[in-house]
Design a protein with these regions (language model features):
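S-adenosylmethionine/decaboxylated-SAM
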Residues: 1-145
Length: 145
């Protein structure tokens, strides 16, 4: 999109360096703001920066699945009115599709917390939510004005 600007967060040093290299090679330094660090810390610093430059039309969350509610709460604070928040991997390897398969110890907490997050979203009358089954699931959440 002409005139669009992207702010993205990377916590892995090697991926950050790789992203910097790609952004430079594509000449997109003026349009992509790459931040290094833990997403919680970076988001909290953006929330404290109360300028319009730190408010977004679209936010994409792809983070620790058991903490999506916390990331969503931060994303909502950073959103412009009417913004869209997209959450990736909402079906957690298919465990949230109603299957009776036990997710096992490794995924049990993530599955429980993701179910709680989905219930929270469904209870919010000020949101329009679409859950898409593509890939590992996407939630497209529109903040109603």
């Amino acid at each position: 999109c002409e005139g669009a600007h992207i702010t993205t967060i990377e916590r892995a040093p090697h991926m950050y360096d790789y992203a910097v290299s790609n952004i430079k090679s594509l000449g997109l330094e003026s349009r992509i703001n790459l931040k290094f660090g833990d997403a919680n810390d970076v988001l909290d610093s953006l929330i404290k920066d109360d300028s319009q430059d730190s408010r977004f039309d679209l936010i994409f969350i792809d983070a620790a699945k058991s903490h999506y509610r916390e990331f969503f709460d931060r994303a909502e604070k950073l959103s412009k009115p009417g913004a869209t928040i997209i959450c990736d991997n909402m079906l957690i390897h298919g465990y949230l599709t109603g299957s009776t398969v036990d997710p096992g110890r490794r995924h049990r907490t993530s599955v429980k917390r993701m179910k709680e997050f989905l219930e929270y979203l469904k209870g919010r009358k000020d949101l329009t939510i679409s859950l898409l089954s593509c890939g590992d699931g996407l939630a497209v959440i529109k903040l109603n004005d």
